[in-house]
Design a protein with these regions (language model features):
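N-terminal pre-catalytic "stem/leader" segment of glycosyltransferase-like enzymes
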Residues: 1-45
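Secretory-pathway luminal glycosyltransferase catalytic domains
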Residues: 45-187
């Protein structure tokens, strides 16, 4: 069995799902680990549910078995020892290496990473585009909102939060999402 860890916001979830879907279409026994969203370490929510996707979710027993945990004590021990020795059933994406074809060859592994490289899913691009199509259901509330937007000079502002807000990441993202940036966008 392969388990793909899902973390982060919607964009990261979409890349992780794309790898999951590719592995699934390769005939692999693959499931998703959504446990990140059940902890207190994040305010983020699992958002892929808006697409009504075919998801197989791993239960805690399957996750623990693949990661080599049997109880809380072994979990603590593994957390300490994996800093020194890599666990053979856990593969953490090495961002410096880029695309790693061997990820698609594995059969029994826990995959942790963002997988933000189209090579992981470009062969199933059309399927992914299909999967990420919003449902066509139009509620009264949505119709009312469309009428309001058409009847006025509408503007949408998206404020990036999370990783962009952390001062240590300013250099990575080029400082593009500063308070000044948002003020200029709204002027």
């Amino acid at each position: 069995m392969i388990i793909v860890e899902v973390t982060g916001g919607l964009g990261n979830q979409m890349f992780q799902y794309a790898l999951y879907r590719r592995l699934q279409l390769l005939g692999k026994d693959v499931k998703l680990d959504l446990s990140f969203y059940h902890t207190k370490q994040t305010l983020r929510k699992f958002e892929l549910g808006i697409f009504n996707l075919p998801l197989q979710v791993a239960d805690q027993r399957e996750i623990c078995r693949l990661k080599g945990y049997t109880n809380d004590a072994s979990r603590i021990q593994k957390a300490f020892t994996t800093r020194i020795y890599k666990h053979p059933c856990i593969y953490t994406e090495d961002l410096d290496k880029g695309y790693q074809d061997m990820v698609l060859q594995k059969d029994s592994v826990y995959l942790s990473g963002y997988w933000q490289n189209e090579c992981y899913f470009k062969e199933i691009r059309n399927r992914i585009l299909e999967d990420f199509t919003f449902p066509q259901e139009v509620t009264d509330r949505k119709q009312d909102m469309v009428r309001q937007m058409k009847g006025s000079n509408s503007v949408s502002v998206h404020v990036r939060r999370g990783d962009y807000l952390q001062s240590g990441n300013a250099g990575i993202y080029g400082g593009i999402c500063t308070l000044t940036y948002y003020r200029k966008a709204m002027d």
